[in-house]
Amino acid sequence: MEVLATDTVSQQERLQAIAEKRRKQAEIESKRRQLEDDRRQLQYLKSKALRERWLLEGTPSSASEGDEDMRKQMQEDEQKARSLEESITRLEKEIDVLEFGESAPAAPKENSAAPSPIRPHSTSPAKEEQKSETMVNAQQTPLGTPKENRKSTPVRSPGGSTMMKAAMYSVEITVEKDKVTGETRVLSSTTLLPRDPLPQGVKVYEDETKVVHAVDGLSENGIQPLSSSEVDELIHKADEVTLSEAGSTTGPAEPRGLAEDVTRTTPSRREITGVEAQPGEATSGPPGIQPGQEPPVTMVFMGYQNVEDEAETKKVLGLQDTIKAELVVIEDSVTPREPAPLNGSAAELPATKEENQTGPTTTPSDTQDLDMKKPRCRCCSVM
């Protein structure tokens, strides 16, 4: 029965402490809102007084009723400003008292080594329990002593109980510090599962989400605790190293064979006026099948260019300084034709005799047909 009564009393005290804390939070919020309103009103009064003073300085020395009213208003505004300044100072002190309690101000540096005075007994049992627990934890884990690795991080709930939050993963980071510049360089980063055995070391940083231990690397001056910014920078560098390693292993440079295959699949035939494309030159096979051909060339498309001038077109296509030649193909016939003489009368008689002796010969129409059957002339450019 006594144990149950004690538990009930402690539970009631905790509820009272929580209610008191909420009441203080609400009071602090209301005082802060009032403080902001007073500051805005004080700023308005100061700017108004400055404007009125500037107007009074520009008026002539002869006083008038309007000037007297303005001076009276300035005096009233100054009194309001003084009262607002006092109210602001009082609210700031009250907020400090509500946030930090009725603790004494910080002692000077020369008295910092003196033992702390006995605290008043006005604090609630819940606060006393929390303070004593904090002191015990501080005595159990002094700075610089090794501590066993834990796979979970303790998180204190609002009710005051300690709840263990399981760790999702661990990261082992190997760093190297330059003694001259003091720069820290990350050598490697390895992700460990929570079930893997964690190496033992000295805890240098801890918060609600992560714990950092220093392993194998004791410096001459001992291990210094890390700040949150240093931990974030270290994690960022480790992520960069991990990404660079992943890129070097999974994303190698494209081999030449792949580039050649891509080049072979793309059409390489290009029609240019004056150049005849041969059938064997349209595509190039693999180097192993046709050793006589040259290896393919990778071409990069740089864009289109609209050219209207013929000279500019030749310049763009590389045909500016070329020589044009005409190729004429002559086929052999049954009776080669002799060139006609300058005077056709002398050769007409033998021709008629030969026609009477040998029979009919080729007519001009047949000659025309023979000329039409000849291949057409082709124009080529000699580069």
UniProtKB/Swiss-Prot annotation:
What positions are modified (Phosphoserine)? S116, S122, S124, S157, S161, S244, S345, S365
- Where a lipid (S-farnesyl cysteine) is covalently attached, the residues are C380
Write out the biased-composition intervals (Polar residues).
133-143, 357-367
Q: Which residues carry this modification: N-acetylmethionine?
A: M1
As stated in the Swiss-Prot or TrEMBL entry, residues carrying the post-translational modification Cysteine methyl ester are C380
**Record localization:** Cell membrane; Cell projection, Filopodium membrane; Cell projection, Axon; Cell projection, Dendrite
Which InterPro entries does the record associate with it?
Paralemmin
**What GO molecular function annotations does the UniProt record carry, in alphabetical order?**
D3 dopamine receptor binding
Q: Where is the signal peptide?
A: none
Q: How does it sit in the membrane?
A: Lipid-anchor
Q: Report any one BP term from Gene Ontology.
A: protein localization
Record function comment: Involved in plasma membrane dynamics and cell process formation. Necessary for axonal and dendritic filopodia induction, for dendritic spine maturation and synapse formation in a palmitoylation-dependent manner.
Quaternary state and partners of this protein?
Interacts with dopamine receptor DRD3.
Q: Which PANTHER family match?
A: PARALEMMIN-1, PARALEMMIN-RELATED
Name this protein carries in UniProt: Paralemmin-1
Recorded source organism is Rattus norvegicus (Rat)
What gene is it encoded by? Palm
